[in-house]
């Protein structure tokens, strides 16, 4: 009997502790929601200043073991031409189970102590009425989130399948799974999204996207800019009957990486395509990478802030036209662009490639810029040579176009345009021969190992063009790039007339002098 009383006492004590902890947690949750909304609004204004979006929490009702709240996404007052009408908003209804052991988690046998477990879904209101008609009265998504005592939020979101037809258009979406992990104050963000298929049909036109996979892992760096990795993979994109073309893109990948050191930011954006078919003709695969290095972190922060400020200012414009607003934003961008040249940034295309069954073409480009001089008033009046010496530290361009590869590409392009195989091959041979001869005529390209190539390097006022070294003034003169005052020094060149005969040879009439 005594042991039973002790057991009952322990249970009552635990229940009292749980009740007290849940009640206390409920009070902490209300504070946490207010802080989270404030942080979310700060990030919305930084990332999407032109939208005027703002998040609000309304109707918070706190109980002992659970609470209710509505989150409303709306727009600021005074915003013109907003997507959301004044007074309307996208409402999310949330039911919050208090910690330390939220009932919703206990039901799933998740016994990790947490501040709260939150179940959220969209509310059917006037703003979302069209969406709920499409989803047949169901919330487009439901979200289950776990809020830790450190303030981080881990969420699992289910986006439901959607299937509807209207005005001859059929829309089918398989649904999606989203997982996110957000730290306190959104300093660290990770996100994954997976979806199987989206199909849109209209008459004989079809658009299909298969196998979407997004993975993001970012953290806020020392310059208040997110650094980290983002990757998107799409298994296949199919377009049939659109503009009488059938297009298939396979293995589409897009990735970006931003990193930082004590003073600079460094970034790389890559695109790749495993396969491209047009009218069932396989054109091959390609890659494209853009790089940036030595971008002064503080300068990038100021540049971004200037753009955001201009965008926010344009939102409340009552009297200016959209063109005037856009012009003001563009002016803000270009007026602050010079600050990005601090620390001699480097930009590049490393590489751009395209590969088919006959070979692979590559383009590599890199430029190192100089910081602008203190007196910027003379920049607009600078002659070409002075501008190059002032702005560019060094630059390189390397192009390799294997002749069999570009011949195959040109043949396929002619086949797509309706030519038969023999005529397509003849036409392609003419095009490649003309490209080669024009490149030689104007000393732009050479032929090396059966590939048309360009090798250009510039540094400190000296240039090497396809193996020939020369000074910057000589290069500008020979290639017709000098100022008008120097035109008398440039040998006159007459462009050859195009020869459309089957021989593919180029006939040069009159005096044609190649630059020497």
Please describe what each predicted stretch is.
Residues 1-5:
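Positively charged n-region of N-terminal signal peptides that target proteins for export
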Residues 8-9, 16-516:
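Glycine-rich, small/hydroxylated-residue low-complexity segments
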């Amino acid at each position: 009997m005594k042991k039973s009383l002790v057991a009952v006492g322990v249970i009552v004590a635990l229940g009292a502790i749980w009740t007290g902890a849940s009640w206390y947690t409920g009070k902490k949750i209300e504070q946490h929601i207010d802080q989270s909304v404030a942080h979310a609004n700060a990030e919305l204004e930084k990332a999407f200043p032109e939208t005027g979006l703002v998040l609000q929490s309304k109707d918070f009702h706190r109980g002992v073991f659970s609470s209710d709240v509505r989150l409303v996404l709306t727009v600021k007052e005074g915003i013109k031409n907003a997507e959301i009408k004044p007074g309307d908003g996208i409402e999310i209804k949330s039911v919050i189970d208090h910690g330390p052991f939220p009932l919703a988690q206990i039901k799933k046998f998740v016994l990790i102590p947490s501040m709260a477990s939150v179940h959220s879904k969209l509310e059917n209101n006037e703003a979302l009425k069209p969406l709920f008609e499409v989803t047949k009265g169901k919330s487009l998504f439901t979200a289950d989130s776990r809020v830790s005592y450190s303030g981080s939020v881990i969420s699992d979101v289910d986006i439901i399948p959607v299937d509807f037809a209207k005005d001859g258009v059929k829309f089918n979406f398989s649904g999606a799974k989203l997982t996110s992990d957000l730290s306190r104050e959104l300093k660290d963000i990770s996100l994954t999204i997976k979806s199987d298929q989206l199909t849109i049909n209209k008459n004989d036109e079809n658009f299909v996207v298969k196998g979407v996979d997004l993975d993001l892992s970012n953290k806020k760096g020392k310059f208040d800019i997110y650094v980290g990795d983002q990757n998107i993979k799409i298994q296949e994109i199919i377009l049939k009957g659109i503009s009488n073309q059938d297009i298939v893109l396979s293995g589409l990948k897009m990735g970006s990486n931003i990193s930082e050191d004590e003073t600079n930011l460094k970034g790389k954006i890559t695109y790749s395509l495993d396969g491209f078919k047009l009218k069932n003709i396989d054109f091959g695969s390609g890659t494209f990478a853009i790089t940036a290095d030595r971008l002064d972190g503080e300068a990038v922060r100021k540049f971004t802030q200037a753009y955001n400020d201009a965008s926010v200012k344009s939102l409340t414009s009552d009297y200016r036209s959209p063109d005037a607003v856009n012009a003001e934003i563009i002016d803000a961008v270009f007026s602050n662009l010079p600050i990005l040249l601090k620390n001699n940034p480097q930009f590049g295309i490393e590489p751009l490639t395209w590969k088919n069954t006959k070979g692979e073409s590559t383009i590599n480009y890199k430029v190192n810029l100089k910081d602008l001089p203190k007196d910027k008033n003379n920049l607009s009046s600078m002659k070409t040579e002075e501008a190059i010496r002032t702005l560019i530290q060094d630059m390189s361009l390397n192009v390799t176009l294997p002749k069999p590869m570009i011949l195959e590409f040109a043949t396929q392009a002619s086949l797509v345009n309706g030519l038969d195989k023999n005529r397509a091959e003849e036409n392609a041979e003419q095009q490649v021969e003309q490209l080669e001869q024009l490149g030689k005529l104007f000393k732009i390209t050479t032929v090396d190992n059966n590939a048309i190539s360009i090798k250009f390097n510039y540094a400190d006022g000296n240039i090497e063009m396809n193996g020939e070294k020369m000074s910057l003034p000589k290069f500008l003169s020979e290639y017709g790039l000098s100022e008008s005052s120097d035109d008398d020094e440039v040998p006159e060149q007459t462009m050859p007339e195009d020869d459309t005969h089957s021989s593919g040879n180029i006939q040069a009439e009159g005096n044609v002098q190649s630059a020497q």
